From Swiss-Prot:
Residues 107-320 are annotated as: Required for binding to Su(var)205. It comes from the Eukaryota. Residues 139-228, 295-328 are annotated as: Disordered. The keyword Iron-sulfur does not apply. It comes from Drosophila erecta. This is Telomere-binding protein cav. The keyword Nucleus applies. GO terms for biological process: telomere capping. Interacts (via C-terminus) with Su(var)205 dimer (via hinge and chromoshadow domain) and with moi to form the terminin, telomere-capping, complex. Interacts with HP6, which is also part of the terminin complex.
Length: 328
């Protein structure tokens, strides 16, 4: 891009601005040193105005700079509007009325349009200031880019230093582990402790039948603690309230644990027949538990029964007793 042409007006304007600032802030005063340093950095020079833009710089400025247009600068109508607003003449008025008031203000020379030469000169000054600002932006962005490029190099150096420190720490940890393993091996090589000698008299009474029965009873109670019938049965056995005839029978655990009758391998003896005859609460008659390998009860009426003389008869039926000897 071509450089900006410097007119005589712009050159004179910049020289006048520099002279005014230096006259106001004397170099002899040490307090004005910072102000003069800032003025020297921000002062518009001919070299700045002659500096051309590259395509990349123009593209970066267009992408990163917001463009604003000031429509109120050197506008006589804007000045008339400010005067009418101060008096409240435009409150609740139509747009047609407002336009007539603008024309009236210009016609009566309340405000006058700015000369074209004056507007061109002011635009030239604004363009020079804008270019100085753009140059400052480009220099700042270039400095940031260089810092970002140098940041990865510094970070890689830090990573290398950190990796070296980690390797040293790992070596220290491995040395400590080797020392610990050596100590553990030396401890394992020590003689084992002597076990106490147990005599035969100390083992007397271990494994007796009474202990085995108690152990089996405790295991049975532990396995069937969830069953309420089993718990009730165990409580009756421990309290001694259960008849001896039932506790000595092999069918007691089967009936109370699984809800079944006597097993087929068990035959009641003559001493147990009186205990086996239990009155049925519904018919108030004697009820037989097991006869001829079948479940026989008055309430269920299943299968035949054998009386005390050895005759077979059917429950709830009018049939005569059956002679076992004749059947043989």
């Amino acid at each position: 891009m071509s450089d900006t042409q410097i007119s005589s007006f712009l050159r004179k304007y910049l020289a006048d601005e520099d002279r005014k600032i230096r006259a106001q802030f004397k170099e002899s005063d040490p307090k004005n040193k910072l102000i003069l340093w800032m003025h020297e950095k921000t002062r518009i020079t001919e070299d700045d105005l002659k500096r051309p833009y590259t395509k990349d710089e123009v593209r970066e400025l267009c992408l990163r700079t917001k463009v604003k247009v000031d429509m109120t600068a050197w506008n006589c109508l804007w000045e008339a509007k400010k005067r009418f607003d101060a008096k409240g003449r435009f409150e609740n008025k139509s747009e047609k009325f407002i336009n007539r008031m603008y024309m009236k203000a210009v016609r009566r020379k309340m405000v006058q349009p700015y000369p074209e030469e004056y507007v061109a000169q002011r635009r030239e000054v604004i363009a020079a200031e804008t270019k100085k600002f753009n140059i400052s932006r480009l220099d700042r962005w270039q400095k940031q880019k260089s810092q970002n490029r140098s940041a990865p190099e510094s970070s890689s150096a830090l990573v290398g230093h950190a990796s070296q420190q980690d390797s040293q720490d790992n070596e220290a940890v491995e040395t400590h582990e080797d020392q610990a393993n050596t100590n553990r091996y030396s401890v394992s090589q020590m003689e084992p402790m002597a076990r106490p000698v147990v005599s035969a008299s100390d083992l007397s009474g271990i494994g007796d039948d009474e202990d085995e029965q108690q152990q089996q009873q405790s295991e049975f109670q532990t396995e069937h603690t969830d069953c309420p019938e089993t718990q009730m049965r165990c409580d009756q056995i421990n309290s001694g309230s259960l008849p001896m005839g039932l506790t000595n029978s092999e069918s007691a655990p089967d009936y109370y644990m699984f809800g079944t009758q006597l097993s087929t391998s068990v035959r009641p003896t003559s001493t147990q027949e009186a205990d086996d005859q239990i009155a049925c609460p519904e018919t108030e008659t004697n009820e037989s538990w097991v006869r001829c390998d079948q479940i026989n009860s008055e309430s269920m009426s299943i299968g035949p029964s054998i009386d005390s003389e050895g005759n077979i008869s059917l429950q709830n039926s009018g049939s005569e007793p059956i002679d076992v000897d004749s059947m043989a």
